[in-house]
UniProtKB/Swiss-Prot annotation:
Biological or metabolic pathway of the protein: Amino-acid biosynthesis; L-methionine biosynthesis via salvage pathway; L-methionine from S-methyl-5-thio-alpha-D-ribose 1-phosphate: step 5/6
Gene this protein is translated from: adi1
Single Gene Ontology BP annotation: L-methionine salvage from methylthioadenosine
General function of this protein: Catalyzes 2 different reactions between oxygen and the acireductone 1,2-dihydroxy-3-keto-5-methylthiopentene (DHK-MTPene) depending upon the metal bound in the active site. Fe-containing acireductone dioxygenase (Fe-ARD) produces formate and 2-keto-4-methylthiobutyrate (KMTB), the alpha-ketoacid precursor of methionine in the methionine recycle pathway. Ni-containing acireductone dioxygenase (Ni-ARD) produces methylthiopropionate, carbon monoxide and formate, and does not lie on the methionine recycle pathway.
Cofactor note: Binds either 1 Fe or Ni cation per monomer. Iron-binding promotes an acireductone dioxygenase reaction producing 2-keto-4-methylthiobutyrate, while nickel-binding promotes an acireductone dioxygenase reaction producing 3-(methylsulfanyl)propanoate.
Catalytic function, reaction form: 1,2-dihydroxy-5-(methylsulfanyl)pent-1-en-3-one + O2 = 4-methylsulfanyl-2-oxobutanoate + formate + 2 H(+); 1,2-dihydroxy-5-(methylsulfanyl)pent-1-en-3-one + O2 = 3-(methylsulfanyl)propanoate + CO + formate + 2 H(+)
SUPFAM superfamilies: RmlC-like cupins
Protein name: Acireductone dioxygenase
Compartment(s) where it occurs, according to its Swiss-Prot or TrEMBL record: Cytoplasm; Nucleus
Cofactor: Fe(2+); Ni(2+)
InterPro entries assigned to the protein according to its UniProt record, in alphabetical order: ARD (IPR004313), ARD_euk (IPR027496), RmlC-like_jellyroll (IPR014710), RmlC_Cupin_sf (IPR011051)
Length: 176
């Protein structure tokens, strides 16, 4: 895992967009983002048990697996959104980027690769893309039945109770 400030330059979302300014993992924790590196899936099983993740599935995001809908899906994943539950991803192969909003409403880019696990809190604005190799395989973990319901950023979603709860846990973001 490597986290850094997104450079906001034009170009393909799958490029690095590396500003050259790294972000410390402790800063991610301040935003509510948790990161682990697990070479053994048994460690993932323990985390799942400890955090009451009852369900999981595996998704492969690639042109070979998704065919003609790949580009459309990657663009959809890159729309800024939040979820009403945690987003947990354990990278089994390939690499990709999660971008999360900072307290200054800037993007922090988090590069994940094999054996990285990330937990995004409910209510955090974020987006996802593969890297320029166009391939990632990830285990998705869920507390309840598997679902992926993005709520795209806008005034209505800003008023969402899960967003408000997130803002209460991260006061620096709420004061924007």
């Amino acid at each position: 895992m490597r986290a850094y400030w997104f450079d906001n330059k034009e170009g393909d979302q799958r490029e690095l967009h590396d500003s050259g300014r790294d972000v410390d993992p402790e800063y991610l924790e301040k935003l509510g983002v948790l990161y682990y590196h697990f070479a053994d899936e048994k460690d993932v099983d323990k985390l799942a048990s400890d955090r009451s993740y009852k369900n999981r599935d595996v998704i492969t995001v690639s042109p070979q697996k998704m065919g003609d809908v790949y580009e459309e899906k990657v663009k959809m994943f890159f729309n800024e959104h939040l979820h009403e539950d945690e987003e947990i991803r354990y990278i089994r192969d390939g690499a990709g980027f999660f971008d999360v909003r900072s307290e200054g409403d800037e993007w922090v880019r988090i590069r994940l690769e094999k054996d990285d696990l990330i937990i995004l809190p409910a209510g955090i604005y974020h987006r996802f893309t593969t890297d320029d190799k166009n391939y990632i395989q990830a285990m998705r973990l869920f507390k309840e039945e598997p679902k992926w319901t993005p709520l795209n950023r806008g005034p209505e979603v800003d008023a969402n109770p899960y967003r408000k709860e997130y803002l209460q846990t991260v006061p620096a973001i709420a004061s924007q």
